Amino acid sequence: IRRLEALIMAAPPPTRPGRILLGCPPQEQHIIGPLLLTFLLRRRGWQVIYLGPNVPADQLESTIEITQPQLVILSAQLLHTAATLLEASKLLQQVRVPLAYGGLVFNMLPKLRERIPGHFLGERLEAAPQVIETLVATGSDPLITSGMTLTVGDRLRSSADSYALLG
């Protein structure tokens, strides 16, 4: 972890407009994934403020007020922390800041994605920076009522279903 933190600190200064907050919801202690994502985003020129593990809702809210981020990213690895991520997502809706999220629990239990009002970043960490860049560039909607990101398979099935309806 110390080496990863050193790499993050050595990343070049931000070259892109906007700010991203990244951390873990209350009770989530797993930090390797969020640290890796922080590193990947900083290497791509983003200003990322890493909040760390177990971020209380009141701290998240005050940090949002101060930093005015374009996107908040939260990571949950366990079922009970997916529930705390859901609570955090409701706060983000109230303050109208878009949420992106990911983590092992959403890969293992894909139906959970339907419950989280935000953008699922996908099952592979290395693909997340491109998804995040698209979300920031398009000004993602902070009032999403359910998980919206589709996998390639979902898109193909949806296209096939649409084609069947038209045919």
What are these regions (language model features)?
Residues H119-A128:
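Short acidic-hydrophobic, aromatic-tinged amphipathic segments that line or gate anion-handling sites
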Residues D58, A83-L86, K111, E126, ...:
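Generic alpha-helical secondary structure signal
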Residues I1-P98:
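Conserved mid-sequence domains
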Residues E133-G167:
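Core of compact, soluble alpha-helical bundle domains
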Residues F106-G118:
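Glycine-rich, charge-decorated loop segments at or immediately adjacent to ligand/cofactor-binding or catalytic sites
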Residues P110-K111, P129-V136:
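Short, charged, surface-exposed secondary-structure boundary motifs
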Residues P53, Q77, L104-F106, L125-E126:
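Short, ordered loop/turn segments at secondary-structure junctions
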Residues P98-L104:
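Short beta-strand elements of ligand-binding domains
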